[in-house]
């Protein structure tokens, strides 16, 4: 029986899991919808919902707490200026997880995790390497 065991290890060290969820949280805040495996999506949801709850209260202290977890100043700014006010009146339940079939290579169950009232235009925005103009 697995009583009192919470969360999954994903065959990673604690530091690797922490970094993985920080990166996935930043990606979800940036694009407002990501595709990942179902177990990762299930473990990512409480992490992101706690960040959104922090984003509803804009103070120096909550910004520092969010920065300690996200490690991305632009995503912290979006969390407090866009997402926090958007979910100000909602008492939780900011994310939804929808099953998205199975991955081709290893048949792993996939899921789409997204914000409930997401901005449709945010998906894929500013993704990929930045374009640097050559001054030749």
Swiss-Prot record:
One of its GO terms (molecular function) is structural constituent of ribosome. GO terms for biological process: translation. Keywords: Ribonucleoprotein, Ribosomal protein. One of its GO terms (cellular component) is cytosolic large ribosomal subunit. The keyword Repeat does not apply. SUPFAM superfamilies: Prokaryotic ribosomal protein L17. InterPro entries: Ribosomal_bL17, Ribosomal_bL17_CS, Ribosomal_bL17_sf. Belongs to the bacterial ribosomal protein bL17 family. Part of the 50S ribosomal subunit. Contacts protein L32. This is Large ribosomal subunit protein bL17. It comes from Methylobacterium radiotolerans (strain ATCC 27329 / DSM 1819 / JCM 2831 / NBRC 15690 / NCIMB 10815 / 0-1). The gene is rplQ.
């Amino acid at each position: 029986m697995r009583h009192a065991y919470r969360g999954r290890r994903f065959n990673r060290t604690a530091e690797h899991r922490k970094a993985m969820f920080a990166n996935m949280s930043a990606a979800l805040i940036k694009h407002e919808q990501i595709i990942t495996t179902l177990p990762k999506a299930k473990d990512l949801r409480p992490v992101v919902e706690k960040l959104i709850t922090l984003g509803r209260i804009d103070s120096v202290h909550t910004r520092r707490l969010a920065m300690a977890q996200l490690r991305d100043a632009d995503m912290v700014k979006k969390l407090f200026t866009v997402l926090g006010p958007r979910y100000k009146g909602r008492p939780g339940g900011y994310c939804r997880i929808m099953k998205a079939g199975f991955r081709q290579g290893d048949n792993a169950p996939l899921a789409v995790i997204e914000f409930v009232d997401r901005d449709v235009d945010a998906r894929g925005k500013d993704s990929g390497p930045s374009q640097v103009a050559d001054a030749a």
